[in-house]
Amino acid sequence: MEEQVVNAIQIASNPSADQALKAQAFDYVNQLRSDPSGWQICLALFTKTPQHSEVVRHVALEVVNSAAQAGLIDPQALGYVRDGLMAYLRQVYAQETATPDSPGIQNKIAQTITFLFSALYGNGWESFFDDLLSLTYKSPSSTGRDNAPGIVFYLRVINSIHDEIGDVLVSRSRAEQDKANSLKDLIRMRDMQKIAGSWQEILSDWRDGNDIIVEMALKAVGSWVSWIDIGLVVNQTMLDLLFQQLARAQKADLRAGEDKVRDAAVDVFTEIVGKKMKAEDKVDMIIFLNLDTIVSQLSNSPPLHENRFTFKYDTDLAETVAKLVNITVCDIIRALENESTTPESKEKAGGLLQAFLPHILRYFSDEYDEVCSTVIPCVSDLLQYLRKIAKSNPALAAQHSSTLLPILKAIIAKMRYDETSSWGDEDDQADEAEFQELRKRLGVLQQSIAAVNEQLYIDAVSEVVGTTFENLRQSGAQVDWRDLDLALHEMFLFGDIAVKAGSLYTKGVPNNAAAERLVEMMMRMVESDIRSFTHPATQLGYMEICVRYSSFFLNHTQLIPGVLESFLQLIHHPIKKVKTRSWYLFQRLVKQLRAHIGNVAENVVGALGDLLVIRAELASEGSDGDDSDDHEGSVDAVFTSQLYLFEAVGIISSTPTVPTDKQALYAQSVLSPVFVDMEKNLAPAKANDERAVQQIHHDIMALGTLAKGFSDWVPGTHSPASLPAAEVSEVFLQASEATLVALESLKGSFSVRTAARFAFSRLIGVLGSRILPQLPRWIDGLMTQTSSRDEMALFLRLLDQVIFGFKGEIYGILDALLTPFLQRVFSGIADPTTGTDDEIHLAELKREYINFLLAVLNNDLGAVIISERNQPMFDTVITTIEHFAKDVEDYTTAKMAFSLLSKMGSSWGGPDITPDGANGATAQQVALPGFGQFMITRMSPLCWALPATPSFNSKDAQAKQVLAEAGGLQRTIYGKTGMEYIEYLRDRELPSMGMGAELVEEFVGALSRLDLKGFRQFFPSFIQRLSA
């Protein structure tokens, strides 16, 4: 059997073994894991002499571990495993002649021993730590802990036990945490003194002898200190041993591994400070440990002082010391903020804070970002603390300037690209992302400083920006791009305190002192020669700032032509990332400055001509060589950015100063090449040429986007208030026709339908009611047999907006197209669903269908639904609404269905005949013959059908809302039919449901007595009582 197991493990781990044989071996080993007796074979394999190969022993012990964790080994058998492993450990780790296992095997044994500790320390293995400690001696007569292999293994288990029961970062169930707490209590009661003593002895005996042992011992002290008596670590004997290890930091040259010992010693102090205790006790302990002196000595040690700014600088040590500074300062500030801290302790904490300020600045201003990031939490805490003080006593804000200014200067310095950075290099994308994330965090700190002392912040940033632009004025392109980028970045952030309600100005005057200063900065930036901004980062920064502070140009309109010229230079940038971003920023700028741009369209259209050529690329194709895998370089992203140029052209061409005939000319000059391209690609697109279809999609999107630039109209608000002149509309009528021709030829293409739907929504803004005669063709192209439910829902939403915008002109067209249009919607609703997404889209389509009918009714077009042409469809409409009103699986749609039925009732039920009108309907309303009876016999039963469904829960919040809407429908029916409805309820409907006379009278009494709001509240509670 042993031989079989060994063979199986060897085959499974052999990369060159036959795959079928390997699969059999894997299956065999996996069966062994679940075999109740498998662990016994594997334990024997592991401890056997002579030893098997490492992989066999590793897998064998893994099987034992799996069996133990799966509960396949009973407590008595666990004792057998313990005895077997301890005998092995004494044989291998407690004899000088033995060869210890590899670190991998040692970790696996430590894992098994740790599991046995969890299972048996409280129940049968009380001598656990004594047994392990016996391994640390070469012989019983040894006077010190002299057995290195045994010590290493002991410390490995000690650290493993902490991971199992003490590590707060490990997620545990309530039962697991309770067990961990119980084990910690047992250790503290039985063995903690002994364990702590062993650490001292090991650190003393091996302080200069074995760096691995010392490092492991320090890690054990540092990890266990969080849950043991602090006095076991913070005592003179232990501290002397720790200081001895810290002294390694003073060495100029360390042997291999010595740096890890030194860093582990610093980490012990960090863990000591991090231990939970009262604020007063923490302050006293920081003073007792003399941490200020420790940090000072470490900061002045050769690795951090003499070697700073050289390649020998020890960043690991710097980050380790920074962690100690961070946690110490956080605790000092916590003590200062804690209301229960005594005045005496607060005074001590204040002194400590002043002592640690140089340390904060030292590591916060460190040239390595990972070191700086380590102390950001304590800097943030410090600034929040100072902010609270300044808020409670503004007079103190000035006193803190000596603290704030160095921090602010350090923040600004850290926001600068370092000398080794190469902006835009694809190989450095990860570094760039990390730097931008650091800038965000530093920006938050800057805002905190501004909140404490705004004037200090204003002056500091003004100095940086002012100095940079003065240097730029004198030296031009000689200014380091990093300095200019920093100034621009600070200007961008400055708006957080200068901009109010999106503007630098209020009634033409700067908002505040910050806005005044920013206006000065803007003036200096704009007056600089754009050719001095030679680096892509600064060119982007320039454009971003112009867009963010466009209100500056609204108050300095004389500067607009120069800025436009600068942008026109940059939109042809050779670097794609800059070029595509500039297209978006250009559109943003001209949109915000539209009213003040002037008649510059001819120049702009001419300058942009080569960038308006549309070239569709398939995502799988290679690019022109300068693409990257980042988002900006993707095919879709580049075309999306190009669309911003089309919109920008539309905006500039339609400014008030451009004559009407010129507007039409510019629109035609942009559209004509697109029309030609569509005509050229239509035939291959029909033949399913994928690239041609994509080209048509892009062309249609461009047409719609140009129209968007020409009109401010947003679908769903109102009919376009000021349509373009007739000559311009005529040009876009051609665009509409071209889109329809493409759509009619390619309506089977999802991407073409998507583009056409977008274009339709934008063309409305430039065509107004002129688009209405084309509406049947749009519907035919966009509501095809292959249209998804999602597409139908989106188009229904768009039609709602058309109805709202042109309700006075759409009746005839709507009358003609309603029946075929609704038939397509019904077909979409009736199609079977496959999967969750399909069900979501079906629910959305139902709701948009109801919203469409509501839009028709709300805009006084209800007559179209019951016109002679559409009368045959009316019953189907009602049937679908009845179905939705009874759907217990979709309360949202059911609620909307009842709302629609109420609207139908108030529209077609004639004038209210009860004293208290249900819906405030006017007396002039004309009743649809027979609709009153229809409401009573068809609509009223629906109010009871939903709650009668077995799965209906009347206590559900959404269900109550549906019932309230159903109550509203009943109140509407009563408002239109009066006693006729009361008699029907009393004599027929309610008794037929088995309702007793008393309940019937209660219900009809409430219906006739309560107003709409009152009955909407009554009906859900009535149903709830019936369901009880």
UniProtKB/Swiss-Prot annotation:
<dbReference type="InterPro" id="IPR040017">
    <property type="entry name" value="XPOT"/>
</dbReference>
<comment type="similarity">
    <text>Belongs to the exportin family.</text>
</comment>
<protein>
    <recommendedName>
        <fullName>Exportin-T</fullName>
    </recommendedName>
</protein>
<keyword id="KW-0819">tRNA processing</keyword>
<keyword id="KW-0539">Nucleus</keyword>
<dbReference type="InterPro" id="IPR045546">
    <property type="entry name" value="Exportin-T_C"/>
</dbReference>
<comment type="function">
    <text>tRNA nucleus export receptor which facilitates tRNA translocation across the nuclear pore complex. Involved in pre-tRNA splicing, probably by affecting the interaction of pre-tRNA with splicing endonuclease.</text>
</comment>
<dbReference type="GO" id="GO:0005737">
    <property type="term" value="C:cytoplasm"/>
</dbReference>
<dbReference type="InterPro" id="IPR011989">
    <property type="entry name" value="ARM-like"/>
</dbReference>
<keyword id="KW-0694">RNA-binding</keyword>
<dbReference type="Pfam" id="PF08389">
    <property type="entry name" value="Xpo1"/>
</dbReference>
<dbReference type="InterPro" id="IPR016024">
    <property type="entry name" value="ARM-type_fold"/>
</dbReference>
<dbReference type="InterPro" id="IPR013598">
    <property type="entry name" value="Exportin-1/Importin-b-like"/>
</dbReference>
<keyword id="KW-0813">Transport</keyword>
<dbReference type="GO" id="GO:0008033">
    <property type="term" value="P:tRNA processing"/>
</dbReference>
<keyword id="KW-0820">tRNA-binding</keyword>
<dbReference type="GO" id="GO:0016363">
    <property type="term" value="C:nuclear matrix"/>
</dbReference>
<dbReference type="GO" id="GO:0005643">
    <property type="term" value="C:nuclear pore"/>
</dbReference>
<dbReference type="GO" id="GO:0000049">
    <property type="term" value="F:tRNA binding"/>
</dbReference>
<keyword id="KW-0963">Cytoplasm</keyword>
<dbReference type="GO" id="GO:0031267">
    <property type="term" value="F:small GTPase binding"/>
</dbReference>
<dbReference type="GO" id="GO:0071528">
    <property type="term" value="P:tRNA re-export from nucleus"/>
</dbReference>
<dbReference type="Pfam" id="PF19282">
    <property type="entry name" value="Exportin-T"/>
</dbReference>
